[in-house]
Amino acid sequence: MKFNFSTIFNILFFLFTLIEANSNGETVKLITSDGIVYSYAVYTKTLAPARVVVKTISYTTTRVYPITLANSVVSSTTEKITEVSTVSASEQVSATQTNSLVSTSTVSTISPTISSGSSTSSSSTYDIESSQSIESSGTSSATAEPSASSGFRLTSSSAFVSSTAPFSSQLSSSSSSETSSSSFSTSSSSAPLSLTSSSSSSSSFATIITLAPSSSKSGNSQLTLASSSSTSAVESSQTGSTIARTTSTLVPSSSVDTTSRATTSMPLESSSTQSISVSSSDGTCYVFYDDDDYYSTVYLTNPSQSVDAATTITSTNTIYATVTI
């Protein structure tokens, strides 16, 4: 047999091609019937795992509600709402990006501050701290000194703070998930004071202290702090919230003892009930105190709002946002 050089070269080229195809896993050589060699490469790519982005946004909204009392004194309630929003997004690094649903949560902290007054010398400040459970028993210690005028002077004092005529009242009540502190300052010698600790949506606690000075203008008077308990259940058609309220009355009596002080403890448990309801279809809720001349009007504009006292509105806001990465 006679073989020329080109035939031997083609046979050797075919053998080397098969060896190269077996040794290289990624490159596969194919030979077709027309003698043309085709080759292709197989490429694989591993996608990176998903990356989670968490972003927290905090901002504060202040709302002021004007309130008109019976003596034509306009008082304002400042509601400070701190909303913390957590934005979570899931990102997958690939040819197309996929973002997951954004989750948002809101925490509301309400600190109302109410001030009203006329031109007399009596003033008082109360601090209320709210913690867990709706049924809690706490005591409130109150001390007062008369001043040399027709009324008496009550000054708030807290721990490590001293004052000439101390009157301190600290109430610890229960709430469900929200902490509220209220500070009240009034300058009327006979107006009732409302102390309020609010809860999230189902219960709240209110304390009303009525200061009723005697008509004696002598500098000698003795304050007797009489404690009574009552409960007010709010039966509102929109919220169904419950208000527990404790009423205490300070009644000064004539005495020649200028150094005497009265101290008592006020249990937070209640015995009697009273109903307050929404009286008109436009969402107006009238809340009355024991004194019929002292009242205010609260407008309920949202089903999530509830009335804790005459000057406090508690609402829960949820904010939803969508972020595209």
Curated annotation (Swiss-Prot):
Coiled coil region boundaries: none
Region annotation Disordered: where it falls in the sequence: 109-148, 167-200, 215-279
Signal peptide bounds: 1-21
This protein's GO CC annotations: cellular bud scar; extracellular region; fungal-type cell wall; fungal-type vacuole; side of membrane
Domain of life the protein comes from: Eukaryota
Annotated membrane topology: Lipid-anchor; GPI-anchor
Main location: secreted
Location within or outside the cell: Secreted, Cell wall; Membrane
Keyword terms: Cell wall, Cell wall biogenesis/degradation, Glycoprotein, GPI-anchor, Lipoprotein, Membrane, Secreted, Signal
GO MF, one example: glucosidase activity
Protein name in the entry: Protein DSE2
Species of origin: Saccharomyces cerevisiae (strain ATCC 204508 / S288c) (Baker's yeast)
Gene designation: DSE2
